[in-house]
């Protein structure tokens, strides 16, 4: 889609939800994961989209797919890149470069239950955004990133620590 098409689409959705705020709340498509073999998992949704993960060989996996942790970082990088592109189009900024890199630091002792004082997930997350735009000032480009960090759904879920509700169904 062109910037103009994105701009028009976003404007239309914003107008619709402004006029119909009760329609903005929806249940997100669930992801269902099953073990394929060993530690290789297959996640699907109702549209039959498939996503695979696996663990490194050193921990008993087959190393046939990215780890779930990498998929989390990829989700954040993709979400931030999408939000930057949407906001740029909305503001009439044509991006010439956009690259979002997400890294993290983890301590595997948490994952492996070696030390209960160490978190199983990332200890921190770093985001590097490289961007350039036609006739856009450095301040405008920085504002795109600042805005995105306030509105990225994946970034929000990670930084806000969304409550989890776990149910178990024994079959």
Can you describe what each PLM-predicted range is?
Residues 1-74, 86-171:
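Extended beta-strand/beta-hairpin segments
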Residues 75-80:
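Alpha-helical metal-binding/catalytic segments enriched in His/Glu/Asp
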